[in-house]
Regions:
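Hydrophobic helical membrane-anchoring modules
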Residues: 14, 177-305
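Acceptor/aglycone-binding surface of glycosyltransferases and processive sugar-polymer synthases
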Residues: 67-69, 74-83, 100-176, 197-207, ...
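Short conserved micro-motifs on helix faces and helix-strand junctions that flank
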Residues: 1, 8, 67-69, 158, ...
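Structured catalytic core of nucleotide-sugar glycosyltransferases
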Residues: 1-127
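Residue-level recognition of specific faces of alpha-helices
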Residues: 61, 73, 88, 102-105, ...
């Protein structure tokens, strides 16, 4: 098998057929009929699965992996990659915001640059002002707290060599962030500037984005724990200096401490920090708890061919 095209389905019913047609044309132009298209149904609540199954009645190059429930975009993608068999794998979203026709230009760049992965980045992030700002903050905070040099505005679409895919799926985290794994897997990678179309509403609201950021950071770095330690050290030192100041004022300047307002404010402030730091440690402990259970990160209900 020369090429595998991997995509996920979630509220994708209006795109499934057109995606298959366009992806098939792109694959045929590149490798003839030696390709497969893998759909991973991530517990989609609409008729995405039914439409994909209908395609299998007419075409024999389709594999559908039906997950038992919604496990999340990243885990669904990894499941699809694990079932791919092509010498090259083209991973892409099925909502047609990312064009299947990019396969050709990605392949040209991969050949020209002799790389193991070519992936797309947007020159301008789509969406409203708030979405653009929160997106930029996500990448900045992620790089700051993990040390992983993830470029801004990456997209799902990417063409990968078989050895790169094998290395990628060797990661066995249960709480995974595939965006970081793409980078730390290594090999020679190159980017291509692309422009996504706006054909659908995003399924990521602010709460999901915040949860994604926390998961991404705590999956790739212990720096938040290091920063917690140094923050505590700094606050302890500051409190010690403040106590010395109060003692000097009391014994040598006959000036008693001021009222309770500043004391209450300080108690609230430090109590908040304590709760925050305990929460950070709790997140890491919960991840360790989940990983030690060694549960599969997805469960497959059925595979259609």
């Amino acid at each position: 098998m020369k090429l595998s095209i991997v995509t996920t389905l979630y509220k994708s019913e209006e795109y499934v057929v057109e995606f298959y047609e366009r992806a098939s044309r792109a694959a045929q132009n590149l490798v003839g009929n030696d390709y497969e298209i893998i759909f991973v149904n991530d517990g989609s609540p609409d008729s995405s699965l039914d439409k994909a199954i209908h395609l299998t009645h007419e075409h024999d190059n389709i594999i559908i992996i039906d997950l038992s429930r919604n496990f999340g975009h990243h885990k669904a993608m990894m499941t699809g990659l694990e079932h791919s068999s092509g010498d090259h794998v083209f991973l892409i979203d099925s909502d047609l915001e990312e064009k299947p026709e990019w396969l050709s230009s990605f392949n040209e760049q991969m050949t020209k640059d002799s790389t193991d992965m070519v992936y797309g980045i947007q020159d301008h992030r789509k969406g409203a002002f708030v979405e653009k700002v929160t997106g930029a903050l996500f990448y900045k905070i992620f790089r700051l707290l993990t040390g992983v040099a993830q470029p801004n505005n990456i997209v799902t679409a990417r063409l990968m060599s078989r050895r790169y895919v094998n290395a990628l799926i060797s990661h066995k985290e249960r709480e995974l962030n595939i965006g970081g794994l793409w980078i730390i897997t290594g090999f020679i990678q190159s980017t291509q500037v692309v422009q996504k179309s706006s054909s659908s509403q995003t399924t990521y609201n602010f709460a999901r984005k915040l949860s994604h950021l926390v998961n991404a950071i705590t999956s790739f770095s212990s720096l938040p724990l290091v920063y917690t330690f140094y923050t505590g050290l700094l606050l302890s030192f500051s409190a010690f200096i403040f106590i010395i100041k109060l003692l000097i004022q009391f014994f040598f300047m006959a000036k008693p401490p001021d009222g309770y307002t500043s004391m209450i404010a300080s108690i609230w402030f430090f109590s908040g920090l304590v709760i925050l730091f305990l929460g950070i440690q709790g997140i890491y402990l919960s991840k360790m708890f989940i990983e030690t259970k060694n549960r599969p990160y997805t469960i497959i209900r059925k595979i259609y061919k």
